[in-house]
């Protein structure tokens, strides 16, 4: 069964946003890493991967502003058994691929404009709480 496993926010202040979610909601940091043109800090509540994305100011990638120019909910991820098959399905439904060719996860613009991504099983491993 496919399910939502990840939610990402685009933020301007990574440290202040991290502190807020840790201090107010008790989220735990899983990892922080540099990914192409942004820093991705992954938090969890024990069930879902919650990423805070801080894009490089000079970045002009399609992904950076796909969901909006300022801070916003950037995208959510759906875990699928077969990323290639799911990609064919979303294309058949008129979706536009936003991520660079060959990049997994596959970010796309769904009907209505929402940005989502397809991820393989177990991409986001939570630290049980």
Identify what each model region corresponds to.
Residues 13, 82, 110:
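Acidic di-acidic motifs
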Residues 66-68, 97:
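Short Gly/Pro-enriched turn/cap motifs at secondary-structure boundaries
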């Amino acid at each position: 069964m496919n399910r939502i496993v990840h939610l990402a926010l685009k933020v301007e202040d990574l440290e202040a946003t991290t502190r807020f979610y840790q201090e107010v909601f008790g989220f735990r940091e899983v990892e922080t890493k540099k990914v192409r043109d942004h820093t991705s800090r992954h938090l969890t509540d024990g069930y879902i991967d919650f990423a805070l994305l801080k894009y490089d100011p000079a970045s002009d990638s399609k992904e950076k502003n796909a969901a909006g120019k300022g801070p916003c909910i950037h995208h959510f991820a759906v875990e699928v058994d077969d990323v290639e098959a799911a990609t064919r399905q979303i294309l058949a439904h008129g979706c536009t691929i936003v991520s660079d060719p060959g990049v997994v996860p596959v970010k796309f613009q769904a009907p209505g404009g929402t940005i989502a991504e397809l991820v393989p099983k177990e991409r986001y491993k939570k630290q049980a709480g």
